[in-house]
Design a protein with these regions (language model features):
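Catalytic phosphate/metal-binding cores of nucleic-acid and nucleotide-processing enzymes, i.e., regions
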Residues: 1-126
Length: 126
């Protein structure tokens, strides 16, 4: 992992990990799941980026232009990421689109369980 220096300290630079999952219609449940996924990815040594958590704070998805802007921003986050992390046990069209975009951008796509296994942390509790 690359290292950076900050005021005389050497620190590890965490790779950016874009978090995607099949989200339900329940906003509260999605927020809870997304936060748990992000924590697991963070604990594995990555800097998680989860549009669902970020955008819900300031965008109104029911406003068409804000919905479109959210999609555009999410694609920009993915372009800047080092890895796409697919979380959860099911895949929907949005996740398939994220995987296809990552492939086009030559960004590694993996699962949360894959990251945790590689990092030696075993499987995460679901």
């Amino acid at each position: 992992m690359p290292r950076i220096r900050e005021k005389g300290k050497e620190m590890k630079k965490r790779p950016l990990a874009y978090i995607t999952a099949h989200w339900s219609d329940n906003e509260y449940e999605n927020t809870e799941r997304a936060a748990k996924f992000c924590r697991a990815v963070y604990d594995a040594g990555f800097s998680p980026i989860c549009p669902l958590l970020i955008h819900s704070l300031f965008l109104r998805d029911e406003v068409p232009q804000e919905h479109k802007d959210g999609l555009d921003m999410a694609r920009d986050y993915l372009r800047r990421s080092n890895v796409l992390v697919v979380c959860g046990s099911s895949v929907d069209e949005a996740v398939k689109n994220d995987i296809a975009m990552a492939e086009r951008l030559r960004i590694t796509a993996t699962t949360l369980d894959g990251i945790l296994t590689v990092k030696g942390q075993g499987r995460r509790d679901k």
